[in-house]
Amino acid sequence: MVKRHKRRKFSGRVCEQIVYTVAGGTDPKTSRPKKPRFQTREEQDEFNRKISEGKLEALVNANFGPTSLYSTLTLDAENEVHTAAEMRQIRNRFYRRLLYKYPNAKIVIVYGQGKSTSRFHLHMISDGIPEDEIGRIWGLGSVVEIRHLREHNYYADADGNKIDHGRDYKALADYLHAHWRKEFGGHRYKASRSCIRPEPEPATEAVREYSPKHPPVAPRGYILVEARTTKYGYQYYKYVVDPRSEHKRNGSRLN
């Protein structure tokens, strides 16, 4: 007899919950969604890419917020490099210099290559490093963009309406994740050890019948912003801390 389990993962102010089918007698503490069967290598690669993408989304959401900085750093003509291996060395040296000066800083850093210029550059999200220090420690070119992460991030729902997800930085994380190319080799991103790595809670048995039209109840203080059944056979739900409650709290401080 098959059963359904549900499992939540909290990443900062975002909660993701999946509901999936398991064989009867499966221990909820160790259960996982059944891995799908793939017809082609491309399908498997796409599945693995989505898993990797989701991990970076959770990492960014768990560690960064409006006090954090997003920066883009470029190389000047004197320091320009032409291979991914050279750029990876530059990234690693910069990363080590940042942590030498700010050992408790949280950092996620990627390198990419411009589509039109083919020039390498870095993107970084950081917390605990002063804005003026980023350019000083970089020292190999320009900081062409540096800004704080947004308090409110809007995403289109199934009907095209823009919904406030608050501190859900999925779009930024996906943008960084997409910079990696297979020919680069190595890992898609580098994250400091100080970053929290979110892990899902142990699963529990789903005693009710759920569907995107009848989702699990949101955790207290959260609202449902996404509900769907995936092509891999499990249900996916996303909840965020209600951004309206943030408006109320921020407003009360001003009174």
List the predicted regions and their residue ranges:
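Calcium-binding loop positions in Ca2+-binding modules
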Residues: 121
